């Protein structure tokens, strides 16, 4: 199985600042020009919401302050500027092969 390691486990960011979340895969999730890494946001009592697919593509309806980058084994989610509604837990997930796996999550809090 591909193991996804997220860092940090939690972070506190002031309104208007940048939040950066990293995800490292135990082996490459990129092939044939695509990186099969995705980012989700989850708030308490709600299902995960897809933010970014294929490493850098913004899901429809997601604000442009969310962006994703990376390839191979190293990926990043950036949120800038952070808004109050962004307080949530963020997960990376790969779809390179079965089983699909998720990172352990990063909890974003506002200062």
UniProtKB/Swiss-Prot annotation:
<feature type="region of interest" description="Complementarity-determining-1">
    <location>
        <begin position="24"/>
        <end position="38"/>
    </location>
</feature>
<keyword id="KW-1280">Immunoglobulin</keyword>
<dbReference type="InterPro" id="IPR050150">
    <property type="entry name" value="IgV_Light_Chain"/>
</dbReference>
<feature type="region of interest" description="Framework-1">
    <location>
        <begin position="1"/>
        <end position="23"/>
    </location>
</feature>
<keyword id="KW-0391">Immunity</keyword>
<keyword id="KW-1064">Adaptive immunity</keyword>
<dbReference type="GO" id="GO:0006955">
    <property type="term" value="P:immune response"/>
</dbReference>
<dbReference type="InterPro" id="IPR036179">
    <property type="entry name" value="Ig-like_dom_sf"/>
</dbReference>
<dbReference type="GO" id="GO:0019814">
    <property type="term" value="C:immunoglobulin complex"/>
</dbReference>
<feature type="disulfide bond">
    <location>
        <begin position="23"/>
        <end position="92"/>
    </location>
</feature>
<protein>
    <recommendedName>
        <fullName>Ig kappa chain V-III region PC 7175</fullName>
    </recommendedName>
</protein>
<dbReference type="InterPro" id="IPR013106">
    <property type="entry name" value="Ig_V-set"/>
</dbReference>
<feature type="region of interest" description="Framework-4">
    <location>
        <begin position="102"/>
        <end position="111"/>
    </location>
</feature>
<keyword id="KW-1015">Disulfide bond</keyword>
<dbReference type="InterPro" id="IPR013783">
    <property type="entry name" value="Ig-like_fold"/>
</dbReference>
<feature type="region of interest" description="Complementarity-determining-3">
    <location>
        <begin position="93"/>
        <end position="101"/>
    </location>
</feature>
<feature type="region of interest" description="Framework-2">
    <location>
        <begin position="39"/>
        <end position="53"/>
    </location>
</feature>
<feature type="region of interest" description="Framework-3">
    <location>
        <begin position="61"/>
        <end position="92"/>
    </location>
</feature>
<dbReference type="Pfam" id="PF07686">
    <property type="entry name" value="V-set"/>
</dbReference>
<dbReference type="InterPro" id="IPR007110">
    <property type="entry name" value="Ig-like_dom"/>
</dbReference>
<dbReference type="InterPro" id="IPR003599">
    <property type="entry name" value="Ig_sub"/>
</dbReference>
<dbReference type="GO" id="GO:0002250">
    <property type="term" value="P:adaptive immune response"/>
</dbReference>
<feature type="region of interest" description="Complementarity-determining-2">
    <location>
        <begin position="54"/>
        <end position="60"/>
    </location>
</feature>
